[in-house]
């Protein structure tokens, strides 16, 4: 029904509940993306360390 919680009103506007729900979903998505980015950064850091170690071994073998 028009004006019910979560329903789109006849004029096309949304109610406060819908806006709040959208904001919470957006926040969840941003937090999830931040966690993924941090995990990727940590993985990259480990890969760089591994690469540095391999380069050191190569340097030692070629001396």
Swiss-Prot record:
Residues 1-23 are annotated as: Disordered. Pfam families: IATP. It comes from the Eukaryota. Keywords: Coiled coil, Mitochondrion. Residues 18-62 form a coiled coil. GO terms for cellular component: mitochondrion. SUPFAM superfamilies: F1 ATPase inhibitor, IF1, C-terminal domain. The keyword Glycoprotein does not apply. It is found in: Mitochondrion. One of its GO terms (molecular function) is ATPase inhibitor activity. InterPro entries: ATPase_inhibitor_mt. This protein forms a one-to-one complex with ATPase to inhibit the enzyme activity completely. Belongs to the ATPase inhibitor family. This is ATPase inhibitor, mitochondrial. It comes from Cyberlindnera jadinii (Torula yeast).
């Amino acid at each position: 029904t028009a004006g019910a919680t979560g329903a789109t009103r006849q004029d096309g506007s949304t109610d406060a509940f819908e806006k709040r729900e959208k904001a919470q979903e957006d926040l969840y998505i941003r937090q999830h993306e931040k966690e993924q980015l941090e995990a990727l950064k940590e993985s990259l850091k480990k890969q760089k360390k591994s690469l540095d170690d391999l380069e050191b071994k190569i340097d030692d073998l070629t001396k």
